[in-house]
Curated annotation (Swiss-Prot):
Disulfide bonds: 34-41, 101-214, 231-238
Leader peptide range in chain numbering: 1-30
Alphabetized UniProt keyword annotations: Disulfide bond, Glycoprotein, Hormone, Secreted, Signal
Organism placement in taxonomy: Eukaryota, Metazoa, Chordata, Craniata, Vertebrata
A Pfam match: Hormone_1
Source organism of this protein record: Rattus norvegicus
Protein name: Prolactin-8A5
Family indicated by similarity: Belongs to the somatotropin/prolactin family.
InterPro entries: 4_helix_cytokine-like_core (IPR009079), Somatotropin/Prolactin (IPR001400), Somatotropin_CS (IPR018116)
Length: 238
């Protein structure tokens, strides 16, 4: 499902980041040189970016698989088909659930080509932070629901764990690249948390519909950002 979140313009802005910030590569000069160890040179920052990019790719793949499974598995296929039909009919409640993402609040206001690397690194951290609470509660609620297939529950658990580890990687990278940087990690509550915890089955599936739809978009942003930031900060894999 394609979300109405101005994706083309946002991804266009990310691509502009590559071009417009090439002049900022001198920031890489302030990063400690690689550490010499037996067998060659070890660059901890490079390793952290490799880990972050790998986890971002894993998140993207898992979210795509989970999204498809919710539509195809007997556990949720009927509810997701009904919600999709209501979305097509532009039902106001379902339209919001299917097109508005909690993490959309983490996107900075566009300033054309004047994009700051530190700001986008913080934005990546915020995307992970915004996803942390919904994924945590998704695992709890799925574990308590009857008839949840192991394939769905295991993917939800893997998503939560990989997101948490990616958040740790990004926090570490920020402290190494911008040692004096400050970031306020105050993530607002997920709008659909009360729906997910509700005893009303329709409300619960509406929350799952919102989260699975948004994860499909958010994890692609994660992956794109990690590749661009890796290029700009380390000068590798450009």
């Amino acid at each position: 499902m394609e979300l109405a979140l101005s994706q083309p313009s946002f991804f266009g802005t990310l691509l502009m980041l590559v071009v417009s910030n090439l002049l900022l590569w001198e920031k890489a000069a302030s990063i400690p040189a690689c550490m010499v160890e037996d067998g060659g040179c070890w660059d901890p920052l490079r390793e952290a970016f490799n880990s972050a990019t790998q986890r971002a790719e894993t998140l993207r793949n898992l979210s795509d698989q989970l999204y498809v499974e919710f539509f195809q598995n007997q556990f949720s296929s009927r509810q997701f088909a009904d919600l999709s039909s209501q979305l097509i009919r532009k039902d106001e409640t379902v339209l919001k659930a299917g097109t508005y993402c909690h993490s959309n609040r983490a996107k900075p206001k566009s300033r054309g080509v004047n994009i700051d690397i530190e700001e986008y690194l913080k934005m990546s951290i915020n995307f992970c932070g915004f996803m942390d609470q919904p994924l945590f509660h998704l695992v709890i609620e799925l574990s308590a629901m009857e008839g949840v297939p192991e394939t769905i529950l295991s993917k939800a658990k893997d998503l939560e764990e990989n997101n948490r580890q990616l958040l740790d990687d990004l926090r570490w990278i920020l402290t190494k690249v911008f040692p004096t940087a400050e970031i306020k990690e105050e993530f607002p509550s997920w709008d659909y948390l009360s729906f997910l915890k509700s005893s009303n089955k329709n409300h619960k599936f509406l929350a799952i519909f919102n989260l699975s739809s948004c994860l499909d978009y958010d994890t692609q942003v994660h992956y794109t950002l990690s590749q661009i930031l890796n290029c700009l900060i380390t000068g590798k894999d450009c």
